[in-house]
């Protein structure tokens, strides 16, 4: 009896144990990452030919303690390598694991290689050659703490390489994991199987091979036992012949069918090629099709299973499309696949919950470094009384109501950018802004007391509902997460896409960037204030401090300002402001842009202006500013400096976002100034629900 070890992906060990026992293995013992088992020579070959789940089958040769590199060398050399393979055979060493002595796997592999070569040369035998790419013998050494385990890898290449897939092609899941997904899906061979996002067809091919009793090792050309001196060619040929006979019989007797589709024509062509090379091409119908066009291929029955590994995303900007995809798939399943089963394997359990289906079973597994889950569902047959359930239905109803109200109003106003929803319902704590045919959803970061998983699921429901209610393409929705603002975090960079969208606001044309920054380049709540500045600016010299992207300057320029001066500390935003001015034909010496610390510039400037707009941060302690700034504490000092630049009869429009801001009217009076609060006049319909989003004042000489 041979003592053997079969490795597998984490989470598949028990499934592999059952498979090996069915092949005739005895004394099976599950450990993390594999199964120890025993069997005769025939069982060795049977496990190599028939295991759909094992990554490798290895023959343990021994263990040794490693306290120095010499210990490793001597421990390896103690094995009788000259009885394992002939000197004419090539070999390779795979070394994994480190300890205090062996700190580099390449160094460990070199010491093992030296020990094996010296085992031959000391017996005056020819030196065996190393072949890293296609060796006759593979030696596997795993170092864990002070113990090195040495084994002969009888597989050669990993057993996931069945021989039907182009090795250069990328695959999101290995064939061994795909086989496990099929086994756990609840699908019964003989019933239809459909994969609507099949990629190169791995799940369907593994299922078809399982259903037709086709051995996964039947198409492999190389094995790790070819140079092994104990290899029994006669028994191997018997195992191989039996597999060929069973495959022919299984294919001839199989009557059901498999269906695969994908939106990428190139991968569908690859899937057809893979299926043909696997010997089951005639059983699978592949077609180029998007999930949105998914239809039941057998509407009159029989019932089958939809099985897939849908895409997932690690970047925030990919989530809206994925949420929409899963939400759409859930609706299609309910509408067209009543009575069928559904099984999805994913690295994102939150996305699976967008299906709005209740899972009957779920399994965990690792796909490389990723923690994944497989969930199985049964789709109930629809009845005349069945009503579709909308995710976040209360939110969807409110958004629908707001859309009806604001869409018509925005057209009448001549604006393309407005707020559709602003945390109207406390449990749906987001802001939804429309920018022409784009939508930005801003999630306010939930309190730490809220379960993170529930918060994420609610956000996914919000996105699915937003896409559905507004009827937008998923790639036109931008998702952002932000803390509740204590000031304008306008300088926080999020990305590098550099994609700008031209929008209109009354008679102004402006550039916005929806993806690269926390803010978009246009503060929507200041829309009316900007229009007022345009109406007040004719024939006047206009100053815009803390100008951001200069949208207020554009309105002043279009309103007939004699000159405009735009000051901001950020070169990025000044360049953006220049683009905005140029877009509206406002160029030349009359329109100056100055990069400076606004507070320092204000103290040193000696010019005069008729109209000044200042919208400072609530608080700032930027390293590039000379002093920390607090708008509540420092607004009087600010007004003192502004008064010096204000021409007789001139006006300052002062705005800030500090909740509960209190204007020091007595202090202003001592400066010879008076203030009129115009906050309510500057709040448009879309911000009427949030009366504290900003406060705004007109300040003139007393």
From Swiss-Prot:
It comes from the Bacteria. It catalyses: guanosine(2445) in 23S rRNA + S-adenosyl-L-methionine = N(2)-methylguanosine(2445) in 23S rRNA + S-adenosyl-L-homocysteine + H(+); guanosine(2069) in 23S rRNA + S-adenosyl-L-methionine = N(2)-methylguanosine(2069) in 23S rRNA + S-adenosyl-L-homocysteine + H(+). Keywords: Cytoplasm, Methyltransferase, RNA-binding, rRNA processing, S-adenosyl-L-methionine, Transferase. Its EC number is 2.1.1.173, 2.1.1.264. Pfam families: Methyltrans_SAM, RlmL_1st, THUMP, UPF0020. Disulfide bonds: none annotated. One of its GO terms (molecular function) is rRNA (guanine-N7-)-methyltransferase activity. Residues 43-154 form the THUMP domain. It is found in: Cytoplasm. One of its GO terms (cellular component) is cytoplasm. Belongs to the methyltransferase superfamily. RlmKL family. Specifically methylates the guanine in position 2445 (m2G2445) and the guanine in position 2069 (m7G2069) of 23S rRNA. PANTHER family: RIBOSOMAL RNA LARGE SUBUNIT METHYLTRANSFERASE K/L (PTHR47313), RIBOSOMAL RNA LARGE SUBUNIT METHYLTRANSFERASE K_L (PTHR47313:SF1). This is Ribosomal RNA large subunit methyltransferase K/L.
């Amino acid at each position: 009896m041979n003592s053997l070890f079969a490795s597998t992906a984490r989470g598949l060990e028990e499934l592999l144990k059952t498979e090996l026992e069915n092949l005739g293995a005895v004394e099976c013992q599950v450990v993390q990452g594999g199964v120890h088992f025993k069997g005769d020579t025939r069982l060795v070959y049977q496990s190599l030919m028939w295991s759909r789940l094992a990554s490798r089958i290895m023959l343990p040769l021994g263990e040794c303690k490693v306290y120095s590199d010499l210990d490793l060398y001597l421990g390896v050399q103690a094995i009788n390598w000259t009885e394992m393979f002939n000197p004419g055979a090539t070999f390779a060493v795979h070394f994994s694991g480190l300890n205090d002595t062996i700190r580099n796997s390449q160094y460990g592999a070199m010491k093992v290689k030296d020990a094996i070569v010296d085992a031959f040369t000391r017996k005056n035998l020819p030196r065996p050659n190393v072949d890293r790419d296609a060796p006759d013998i593979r030696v596997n050494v795993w170092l864990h703490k002070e113990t090195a385990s040495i084994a002969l890898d009888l597989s050669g290449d990993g057993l996931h390489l069945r021989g039907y897939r182009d090795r250069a092609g990328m695959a999101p899941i290995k064939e061994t994991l795909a086989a496990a997904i099929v086994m756990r899906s609840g699908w019964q061979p003989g019933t239809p199987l459909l994969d609507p996002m099949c990629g190169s067809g791995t799940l369907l091919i593994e299922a078809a091979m399982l259903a037709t009793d086709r051995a996964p090792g039947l198409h492999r050309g190389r094995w790790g036992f070819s140079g092994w001196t104990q290899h029994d060619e006669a028994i191997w040929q018997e195992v191989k012949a039996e597999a060929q006979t069973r495959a022919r019989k299984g294919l001839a007797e199989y009557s059901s069918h498999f269906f695969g589709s994908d939106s990428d024509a190139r991968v569908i062509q690859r899937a057809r090629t893979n299926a043909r090379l696997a010997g089951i091409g005639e059983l699978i119908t592949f077609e180029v099709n998007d999930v949105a066009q998914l239809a039941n291929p057998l509407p009159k029955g029989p019932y089958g299973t939809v099985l897939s590994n849908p895409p997932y995303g690690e970047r925030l900007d990919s989530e809206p499309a994925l949420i929409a995809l899963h939400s759409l798939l859930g609706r299609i399943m309910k509408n067209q696949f009543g009575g069928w089963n559904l099984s999805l394997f994913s690295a994102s359990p939150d996305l699976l919950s967008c299906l709005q289906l209740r899972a009957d079973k779920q399994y965990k597994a690792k796909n490389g470094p990723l923690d994944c889950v497989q969930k199985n569902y049964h789709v109930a047959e629809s009845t005349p009384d069945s009503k579709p359930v909308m995710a976040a239905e209360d939110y969807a109803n409110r958004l629908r109501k707001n859309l009806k109200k604001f869409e018509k109003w925005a057209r009448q106003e001549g604006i393309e950018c407005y707020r559709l929803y602003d945390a109207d319902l406390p449990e749906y704590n987001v802001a939804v802004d429309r920018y022409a045919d784009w939508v930005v959803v801003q999630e306010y970061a939930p309190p730490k007391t809220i379960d993170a998983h529930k918060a994420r699921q609610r956000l996914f429901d919000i996105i699915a509902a937003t896409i559905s209610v507004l009827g937008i393409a998923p790639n036109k929705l931008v998702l952002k997460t932000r803390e509740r603002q204590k000031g304008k975090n306008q300088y926080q960079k999020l990305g590098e896409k550099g994609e700008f969208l031209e929008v209109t606001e009354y008679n102004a044309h402006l550039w916005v960037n929806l993806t690269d920054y926390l803010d978009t380049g246009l503060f929507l709540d200041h829309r009316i204030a900007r229009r007022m500045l345009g109406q007040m600016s004719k024939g006047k010299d206009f100053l815009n401090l803390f100008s951001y992207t200069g949208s207020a300057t554009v309105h002043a320029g279009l309103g007939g300002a004699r000159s405009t001066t735009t000051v901001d500390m950020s070169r990025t935003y000044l360049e953006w402001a220049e683009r905005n001015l140029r877009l509206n034909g406002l160029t030349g010496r009359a329109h100056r842009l100055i990069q400076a610390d606004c507070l320092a510039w204000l103290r040193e400037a000696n010019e005069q202006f008729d109209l000044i707009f200042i919208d400072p941060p609530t608080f700032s302690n930027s390293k590039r500013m000379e002093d920390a700034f607090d708008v509540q504490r420092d607004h009087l000092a600010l007004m003192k400096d502004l008064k010096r630049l204000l021409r007789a009869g001139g006006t300052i429009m002062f705005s800030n976002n500090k909740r509960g801001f209190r204007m020091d009217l007595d202090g202003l009076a001592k400066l010879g100034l008076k203030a009129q609060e115009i906050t309510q006049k500057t709040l448009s319909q879309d911000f009427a629900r949030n009366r504290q989003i900003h406060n705004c004042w007109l300040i003139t000489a007393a």
